[in-house]
């Protein structure tokens, strides 16, 4: 490794651990040598904290970090700010604000939120306004608590009979709508850049909208998708044709990039394949290197 190389720190995302008890997240992360681990609140997943974690649950979670020597500053919250019903939207905002407070109590510095999952073309002016207002309210709370929001680049998903998924452009994967978001959102609000999620709706853009988002990325997930049957199936970076080398070489974000391997049946193998791929990039690149 030369002195000129950009050293990128790699952590591990929580979604591939969603069916495992929380302690096993830490055990697996420790096994690989990760120092950074994402966690989630709500969503009715075995591998997440409850919808409204009490102090005992929070203390138990924080104790795991201390026990395993792993930092957990990244928290995922399940939300949709594009709901058509105004009352349901208001309830969603209240839920998210409560969970942001729980994330802060857990020691998080960043919360990963979603804009919403309806097709971008179905977002009316009214829905757009409510969505922006929701992020403004959540950002104000985050500023008080010392947290930052990273909005995930994530399309709408339809599940096919063959087990694959069809991805539909949302406001966070469509370039024109992303440009509007960059203009309308509070300036503190950033993006969880997930190139794989952008690839599946914009397969011809080999840099996955990096040119548009580069200055606002404050969170990053690493995965790929492969065509299968009627749609796509998630995989490890390096499993398919998404070339991460030029993305890493041009990425301005200097925080933790998290491997997010989604399949449940071979979680550890998928993480290892991802690390092996990063090793190949490091060998090929004069610009980037990786560390855990």
Give the residues covered by each predicted segment.
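Histidine-acidic metal/acid-base catalytic patches
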Residues: 1-11, 18-35, 59, 66, ...
